[in-house]
Amino acid sequence: MAHGLGGTKDSGLEPFARAFAAAGLEVLLFDYRGFGGSGGEPRQVVSLDGQLEDYEAALQAAADLPGVDPSRLVLWGISLAGGHVLRAAADRDDIAAVVSVVPMVDGLAAALHATASHTPGELLRSTARGIRGRLVSRSGRAPVMMPVVARPGEVGALTLPGALEDYLSIAGPTWRNEIAAEVTLELGTRKPAAAAARVDAPLLVQIADFDQSAPPQAAAKAAFKGRAEVRHYPCDHFDLFPGKPWHDAARDHAVAFLVRHLASTKVTADA
């Protein structure tokens, strides 16, 4: 299990993990390189390929734990990581189930989706910051940073009304509200939805129907390609996190899905 864009494992994920552990599943919850409790330099820099490698490393680490059946691994990801898990599970025969929560699965669709809730000026400022960040990183200098979440009208990766307050409500002690700006350029080039058709394991996709951050239509298309079980929630992107109206339902649906497909898994937890 891992978080989305700029997230850390102590920021709203532990309640999901503890629910899975209580249901008899073994849980390995991790931070990406350069974030939270994980090592790596530079800090707060998102590499989509690097995060995918981190998922693959976590799968190997989980498979090596005592008592774990290495042929029955599960992937869980939320937001940006909801796309990572599709890519990580594709073309593997050791994955027993996948849970993709409010997933970001199509960068171009997300960019078009953003035009409905952001002014052209806001989008231009974020893109300009990303371009400057890319140029600076290629020169070998320290990354250009931007907030993960900010208020509407400010520069940030997520600037929708309420996004700052929503993220702060789940933020753990290791979370930092900054991220390397060049990720804004990388996001638009990725389409993990294409990997959904190559996921052979049972797949649960949990969609927030009024999601202003991750396009729900793109998530639904990916779910169809992956022959997924789909759960819809009449809410926005952050409303499936702990303390929000639809968290309990999303958590319980995921638990039921995993128990149904992993009924023989034994109990331990490392959250």
Q: Residue locations for each model-derived region?
A:
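Catalytic active-site module of serine/aspartate enzymes centered on a nucleophile-bearing elbow/loop
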Residues: 233-271
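Conserved alpha/beta-hydrolase
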Residues: 19-40
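Gly/Ala-rich beta-loop-alpha elbow adjacent to hydrolase catalytic centers
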Residues: 77-81, 85
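Conserved alpha/beta-hydrolase "acid-adjacent" motif
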Residues: 212-218
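The serine-hydrolase catalytic nucleophile loop
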Residues: 6-18, 32, 217
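Alpha/beta-hydrolase-fold enzymes
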Residues: 84-167
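Catalytic nucleophile-loop/oxyanion-hole region of alpha/beta-hydrolase
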Residues: 8-12, 35-70, 74, 244-249
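Short beta-strand/loop motif that positions the catalytic acidic residue
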Residues: 199, 205-207
